[in-house]
Every structure is written in C-alpha cells, then in structure tokens.
C-alpha cells in the first residue's frame, strides 16, 4: 500500500517539499539559513501575537503598555525580549543567507532571487515599523527622520509624508497605522516565503561547487532535516543566551525614555541592522541623492544577475573574486560601525569612502575581475 504522505492531497505537497525532495549531496552549513529564517519568522509571529494581546497603539498609553507587559504580564519580559532580539537574529540569518547567495552564485535563479529581494524589503519595513511601537525617544525620532526622507521625492514628497503620518507630524494616527501594518506584514511575508520556495523547487537547489548536481542527489529527510535541527538548536541557544543574559545589548538606551517631540536625542540612529544603509544615506550631502543611494544600496541586488560575467557560477574556484567578496563584507562592517557614529570628522570621510567602495566593488570591480579570471582560464 502506498504511504499516505504520497497520496493525501495536502501531505503530498509537504512530502515533496520537505521529505522526499531531492537535494544535492554537497550542501554545506551555509544552506541552513533558509530553514533558520523560517524558525525566526515563526518565533516572531508567535511572540508578536501574544505581545499584541497586551499592547495598545495609542500615543498616551503605548509606552506604559510595554512597561506593563514587562512588569505585570506572566513572562511578558521574556516575550518582549524574545521578539526584540528575535528581530536581530532574523537579520543576522537574512544577511548571511544573502551573502551565501552572492558567494555561490545562487542569484542565477532569477525568480527565486527577486522574490528574495521583495522579502528583504518586506522584513525591513516590518522591523522599522515595529521599532516605532514602544513609543520611546528613538522610536519617535527614528520614525520622524526616516518617514521625512520621502519629502525628497519631487512634486509629491510633502503630501506623501503627510499622508503617511496622517497629519502634520508623527502622532497617534501614525502609531495606529504602523501597528496595523506591523501586524499584517508578517503574514504577507509568510505568503512570499511560500512563493520563494515554489520557485526554488522549480529549479532545485544550488550547491557550493556551482556545478549541476543532478547525478548526485539525496533525499531531504533524514539527511538535511537532522542538519537543520542542529542549526535550530545552535540559533535558539544563541538567542536564549542573548535574551536571558544581556537583552538590551543591541537596543538603544534612549528608547527607555518616553517619546517627547520637544526634546531631540543627541544621536538619532536606527537599529544596528539598518546602520549600513543609514551610513550610505548620511554620506551624501544632498537629500534626494542620499535617499536614492539608500534605496539603491539594497536594490542593487536586483542587477547582480546581469553583472555576473564569470563562466563559473560559484566563487569557490575563483580566488580573486573571493578577495573582492570579503573586501565587500569588510566595507559593510565599516558602514555599520560608521552608521552608529556622530556626523563629524573623521567619520564623515570614512563613511563616504566606504559608500563609494561598496558601489564600486559591486558595479565595477567584481564584473571586471570575473572577466579577467575568464581570460586567465583561457575561456
């Protein structure tokens, strides 16, 4: 008799996606991050749901409701810190996942890659709106500064900002709509994840060599399920350690001060995972130019498949491209550090140099080095 998992209409889909899925035998731990992101999304939706049961999206009570969650709700402090630090874990996994895709040439699956870029934007939007909800000083001023960037759009900028704010400043209407969108977006993200997986399973997974692995496939279960579970344990241990030992390590102390429109914090900055883009924004002295650079710093991922000049897919056997890739990683770390520093000498010039290098490496140096490698290999 045929197994029910192969005949049942619903189980059949799950079976072909997670059990009998043929997977390349050479996948390294860099392929764990997709499933880790799924766990992160699950943790965020669950903790967020329970937080939403106690949170009030009103400027008068939002800050106090978060305090109430931490002090009076059973394990409310745990929910709150799991949710806040879970976002950090989400972005760590997200950036490593994108980095893996860049290194091993996974972007040649253009549909999967483009849905991934949409997912990245959706997660960034969700995280930004979530940061506004506790209604602390950095929540309020972060929302004011970032939404105000849209006023740089010619003709419609000012009206667009007021439309998003629901008034002439960040206020009750803004907080309420941000809460509504923050609640809604994770479910849209879940739908996009399904589309992402649908496109991935159309082509099959890439592997570290970048060479088609059709002759050498193994079933996903038990080989990769057990490997994924090990990844879950490592990540959840790290998250638990962060939450239980230093929950405020990645947060901003200013967010423990209730929002006050009359008092500006000395340094307005977003959460650490946006600092690289924030540094690029600040390094251009023109408002519209800065906004365009900010958007392009992420959107540049969409043109990477066009810029792929190498005859080889993966960087595994391309040492010169590897050097450039790790230089790009170093530049991103530098930008993240600069984003958290005040706007003064020497940070300004370091940020500008790193921003130029970021675009130069991706747009010019990587394609040029790929062509050189082709020539050296007599292709």
Curated annotation (Swiss-Prot):
Mind telling me which residue stretches traverse the membrane in this protein? 33-53, 77-98, 113-133, 178-198, 226-246, 288-308, 320-340, 347-367
- Which amino acid positions bind a ubiquinone, per UniProt? 201
Q: Name one Pfam family in it.
A: Cytochrome_B
Locations listed in the record = Mitochondrion inner membrane
* Cofactor dependency: heme b
Q: Which CDD domains match?
A: cytochrome_b_C (cd00290), Cytochrome_b_N (cd00284)
Instruction: Write down any Gene Ontology CC term.
Output: mitochondrial inner membrane
Annotated residues that bind heme b b562 are located at 83, 182
> What remark does the entry add?
Heme 1 (or BL or b562) is low-potential and absorbs at about 562 nm, and heme 2 (or BH or b566) is high-potential and absorbs at about 566 nm.
Family named by the database record: Belongs to the cytochrome b family.
Name of the protein this chain belongs to: Cytochrome b
The scientific name of the source species is Vampyressa brocki
> Which gene specifies this protein's sequence?
MT-CYB
């Amino acid at each position: 008799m045929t197994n029910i998992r192969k005949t049942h209409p619903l189980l059949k889909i799950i079976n072909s996606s997670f059990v009998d899925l043929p997977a390349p035998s050479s996948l390294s731990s860099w392929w764990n991050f997709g499933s880790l992101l799924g766990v992160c999304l699950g943790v965020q939706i669950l903790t967020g749901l329970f937080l939403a049961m106690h949170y009030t999206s009103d400027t008068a009570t939002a800050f106090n409701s978060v305090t109430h969650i931490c002090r009076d709700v059973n394990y409310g402090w745990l929910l709150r810190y799991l949710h806040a630090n879970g976002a950090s874990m989400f972005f760590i996994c997200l950036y490593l996942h994108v980095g893996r895709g860049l290194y091993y040439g996974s972007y040649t699956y253009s549909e999967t890659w483009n849905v991934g870029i949409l997912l990245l934007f959706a997660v960034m939007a969700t995280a930004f709106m979530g940061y506004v909800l506790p209604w602390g000083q950095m929540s309020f001023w972060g929302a004011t500064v970032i939404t105000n960037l849209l006023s740089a759009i010619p003709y419609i900028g000012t009206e667009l900002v007021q439309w998003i704010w629901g008034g002439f400043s960040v206020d009750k209407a803004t907080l309420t709509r941000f809460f509504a969108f923050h609640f809604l977006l994770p479910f849209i993200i879940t739908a996009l994840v399904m589309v992402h997986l649908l496109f991935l399973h159309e082509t099959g997974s890439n592997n570290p060599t970048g060479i088609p692995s059709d002759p050498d496939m193994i079933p996903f279960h038990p080989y990769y399920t057990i490997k994924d579970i090990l990844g879950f344990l490592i990540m959840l241990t790290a998250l638990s350690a962060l939450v239980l030992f230093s929950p405020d390590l990645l947060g901003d102390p200013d967010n423990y001060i209730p929002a006050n429109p009359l008092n500006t914090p000395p340094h307005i900055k977003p959460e650490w995972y946006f600092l690289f883009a924030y540094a690029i924004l600040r390094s251009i002295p023109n408002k519209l130019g800065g906004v365009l650079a900010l958007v392009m710093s992420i959107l540049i991922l969409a043109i990477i498949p066009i810029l792929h000049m190498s005859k080889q897919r993966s960087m595994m056997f391309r040492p010169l491209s590897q050097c450039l890739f790790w230089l790009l990683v170093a530049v991103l770390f530098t930008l993240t550090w600069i984003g958290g520093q005040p706007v003064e000498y020497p940070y300004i010039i370091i940020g500008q140099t790193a921003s130029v290098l970021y675009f130069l490496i991706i747009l010019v140096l990587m394609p040029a080095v790929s062509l050189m490698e082709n020539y050296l290999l007599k292709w």
